[in-house]
């Protein structure tokens, strides 16, 4: 192996970086800070922050604490969570990503404009993802969530359709869903689609395709529960079949590097830079 390169564009997106910085800032002056859910979908980064004093809680536990500081992560929260926090005199440190927050407001505004009209909000995203749960909450739980074009039978085509996307989905999949719905729409039903996929995500997909073909072997670093990690890894794999998904250096197998001259290391928007650097150092014995 001659070269090891870490993708300069991989690592935390703006929203995740901001949430982590806010947590670290609070932990400098406070011994105790709660976070509602994992602050990022990467277990190594969560453990690092837990060692500094961050305490991860779930929604049930939020209902049982009072007068505490709680960080709401970049994925956002539904209105019901804010109600519980306010009732319990929780000091909220709101680290909702600005892109997600703007999307929440847009969905809520359109939903509230429905009044008695026959209309529906449809969300393209992972049904169990925290961001999607928060978005559905903007519609009092009435939004329809579809994970692929195969799910569009859940849509009521007798009602107007307003389609949005989770910010970390694959734009080509969103476009396919738009086409499928357009083919089924019958006048006078209204169909409006809003491509709400984050531009950072789109740019990373384009960049990672180029990065992948520059190396003999790719190590893609991501947590098992990273939604954008799955998408970005699949794009890497399409561009370079010699791509391996790892969560840390323990997943690496020495036989991967036989005859390999160039290794690229990249990751999800939830993958810390320090972890990719640690993995790069672990490859030195294979030189």
UniProtKB/Swiss-Prot annotation:
<feature type="binding site">
    <location>
        <position position="227"/>
    </location>
    <ligand>
        <name>isopentenyl diphosphate</name>
    </ligand>
</feature>
<feature type="binding site">
    <location>
        <position position="129"/>
    </location>
    <ligand>
        <name>(2E)-4-hydroxy-3-methylbut-2-enyl diphosphate</name>
    </ligand>
</feature>
<dbReference type="GO" id="GO:0046872">
    <property type="term" value="F:metal ion binding"/>
</dbReference>
<dbReference type="GO" id="GO:0019288">
    <property type="term" value="P:isopentenyl diphosphate biosynthetic process, methylerythritol 4-phosphate pathway"/>
</dbReference>
<comment type="pathway">
    <text>Isoprenoid biosynthesis; isopentenyl diphosphate biosynthesis via DXP pathway; isopentenyl diphosphate from 1-deoxy-D-xylulose 5-phosphate: step 6/6.</text>
</comment>
<feature type="binding site">
    <location>
        <position position="226"/>
    </location>
    <ligand>
        <name>dimethylallyl diphosphate</name>
    </ligand>
</feature>
<keyword id="KW-0408">Iron</keyword>
<feature type="binding site">
    <location>
        <position position="97"/>
    </location>
    <ligand>
        <name>[4Fe-4S] cluster</name>
    </ligand>
</feature>
<feature type="active site" description="Proton donor">
    <location>
        <position position="131"/>
    </location>
</feature>
<comment type="pathway">
    <text>Isoprenoid biosynthesis; dimethylallyl diphosphate biosynthesis; dimethylallyl diphosphate from (2E)-4-hydroxy-3-methylbutenyl diphosphate: step 1/1.</text>
</comment>
<dbReference type="GO" id="GO:0016114">
    <property type="term" value="P:terpenoid biosynthetic process"/>
</dbReference>
<feature type="binding site">
    <location>
        <position position="270"/>
    </location>
    <ligand>
        <name>dimethylallyl diphosphate</name>
    </ligand>
</feature>
<feature type="binding site">
    <location>
        <position position="226"/>
    </location>
    <ligand>
        <name>(2E)-4-hydroxy-3-methylbut-2-enyl diphosphate</name>
    </ligand>
</feature>
<dbReference type="GO" id="GO:0050992">
    <property type="term" value="P:dimethylallyl diphosphate biosynthetic process"/>
</dbReference>
<feature type="binding site">
    <location>
        <position position="270"/>
    </location>
    <ligand>
        <name>isopentenyl diphosphate</name>
    </ligand>
</feature>
<feature type="binding site">
    <location>
        <position position="129"/>
    </location>
    <ligand>
        <name>isopentenyl diphosphate</name>
    </ligand>
</feature>
<keyword id="KW-0560">Oxidoreductase</keyword>
<feature type="binding site">
    <location>
        <position position="228"/>
    </location>
    <ligand>
        <name>dimethylallyl diphosphate</name>
    </ligand>
</feature>
<feature type="binding site">
    <location>
        <position position="41"/>
    </location>
    <ligand>
        <name>dimethylallyl diphosphate</name>
    </ligand>
</feature>
<feature type="binding site">
    <location>
        <position position="75"/>
    </location>
    <ligand>
        <name>isopentenyl diphosphate</name>
    </ligand>
</feature>
<feature type="binding site">
    <location>
        <position position="167"/>
    </location>
    <ligand>
        <name>(2E)-4-hydroxy-3-methylbut-2-enyl diphosphate</name>
    </ligand>
</feature>
<keyword id="KW-0411">Iron-sulfur</keyword>
<feature type="binding site">
    <location>
        <position position="270"/>
    </location>
    <ligand>
        <name>(2E)-4-hydroxy-3-methylbut-2-enyl diphosphate</name>
    </ligand>
</feature>
<dbReference type="InterPro" id="IPR003451">
    <property type="entry name" value="LytB/IspH"/>
</dbReference>
<dbReference type="GO" id="GO:0051539">
    <property type="term" value="F:4 iron, 4 sulfur cluster binding"/>
</dbReference>
<feature type="binding site">
    <location>
        <position position="75"/>
    </location>
    <ligand>
        <name>(2E)-4-hydroxy-3-methylbut-2-enyl diphosphate</name>
    </ligand>
</feature>
<feature type="binding site">
    <location>
        <position position="13"/>
    </location>
    <ligand>
        <name>[4Fe-4S] cluster</name>
    </ligand>
</feature>
<dbReference type="GO" id="GO:0051745">
    <property type="term" value="F:4-hydroxy-3-methylbut-2-enyl diphosphate reductase activity"/>
</dbReference>
<feature type="binding site">
    <location>
        <position position="227"/>
    </location>
    <ligand>
        <name>(2E)-4-hydroxy-3-methylbut-2-enyl diphosphate</name>
    </ligand>
</feature>
<feature type="binding site">
    <location>
        <position position="227"/>
    </location>
    <ligand>
        <name>dimethylallyl diphosphate</name>
    </ligand>
</feature>
<comment type="similarity">
    <text>Belongs to the IspH family.</text>
</comment>
<feature type="binding site">
    <location>
        <position position="228"/>
    </location>
    <ligand>
        <name>isopentenyl diphosphate</name>
    </ligand>
</feature>
<feature type="binding site">
    <location>
        <position position="41"/>
    </location>
    <ligand>
        <name>isopentenyl diphosphate</name>
    </ligand>
</feature>
<dbReference type="Pfam" id="PF02401">
    <property type="entry name" value="LYTB"/>
</dbReference>
<protein>
    <recommendedName>
        <fullName>4-hydroxy-3-methylbut-2-enyl diphosphate reductase</fullName>
        <ecNumber>1.17.7.4</ecNumber>
    </recommendedName>
</protein>
<feature type="binding site">
    <location>
        <position position="228"/>
    </location>
    <ligand>
        <name>(2E)-4-hydroxy-3-methylbut-2-enyl diphosphate</name>
    </ligand>
</feature>
<comment type="function">
    <text>Catalyzes the conversion of 1-hydroxy-2-methyl-2-(E)-butenyl 4-diphosphate (HMBPP) into a mixture of isopentenyl diphosphate (IPP) and dimethylallyl diphosphate (DMAPP). Acts in the terminal step of the DOXP/MEP pathway for isoprenoid precursor biosynthesis.</text>
</comment>
<feature type="binding site">
    <location>
        <position position="41"/>
    </location>
    <ligand>
        <name>(2E)-4-hydroxy-3-methylbut-2-enyl diphosphate</name>
    </ligand>
</feature>
<feature type="binding site">
    <location>
        <position position="75"/>
    </location>
    <ligand>
        <name>dimethylallyl diphosphate</name>
    </ligand>
</feature>
<feature type="binding site">
    <location>
        <position position="226"/>
    </location>
    <ligand>
        <name>isopentenyl diphosphate</name>
    </ligand>
</feature>
<feature type="binding site">
    <location>
        <position position="198"/>
    </location>
    <ligand>
        <name>[4Fe-4S] cluster</name>
    </ligand>
</feature>
<keyword id="KW-0479">Metal-binding</keyword>
């Amino acid at each position: 192996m001659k070269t090891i390169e870490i993708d300069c564009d991989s690592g935390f997106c703006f929203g995740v970086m901001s949430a982590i910085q806010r947590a670290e800032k609070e932990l400098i002056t406070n011994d105790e800070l709660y976070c509602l859910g994992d602050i990022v979908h990467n277990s190594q980064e969560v453990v690092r922050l837990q060692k500094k004093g961050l305490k991860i809680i779930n929604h049930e536990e939020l209902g049982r604490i009072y007068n505490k500081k709680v960080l709401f992560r970049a994925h956002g929260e539904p209105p019901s969570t804010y109600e519980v926090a306010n009732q319990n005199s929780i000091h909220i440190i709101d680290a909702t990503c600005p892109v997600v927050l703007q999307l929440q407001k847009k969905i809520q505004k359109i939903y509230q404009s429905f009044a008695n009209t026959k209309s529906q909000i449809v969300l393209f995203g992972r049904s169990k993802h925290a961001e999607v749960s928060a978005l559905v909450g903007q519609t009092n739980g009435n939004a329809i969530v579809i994970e692929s074009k195969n799910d569009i039978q859940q849509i009521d085509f007798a009602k107007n359709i307003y389609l949005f996307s989770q910010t970390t989905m694959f734009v080509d999949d969103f476009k396919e869903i738009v086409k499928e719905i357009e083919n089924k729409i019958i006048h006078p039903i209204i169909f409006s689609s809003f491509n709400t996929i984050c531009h950072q995500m789109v740019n990373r997909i384009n960049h990672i395709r180029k990065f992948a073909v520059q190396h003999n072997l790719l190590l893609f670093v991501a947590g098992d529960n990273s939604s954008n990690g799955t998408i970005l890894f699949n794009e890497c794999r399409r561009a370079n079949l010699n791509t391996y998904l790892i969560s840390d250096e323990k997943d690496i197998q020495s036989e991967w590097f036989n005859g390999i001259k160039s290794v690229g290391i990249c990751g999800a928007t939830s993958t810390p830079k320090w972890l990719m650097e640690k993995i790069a150092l672990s490859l030195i014995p294979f030189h």
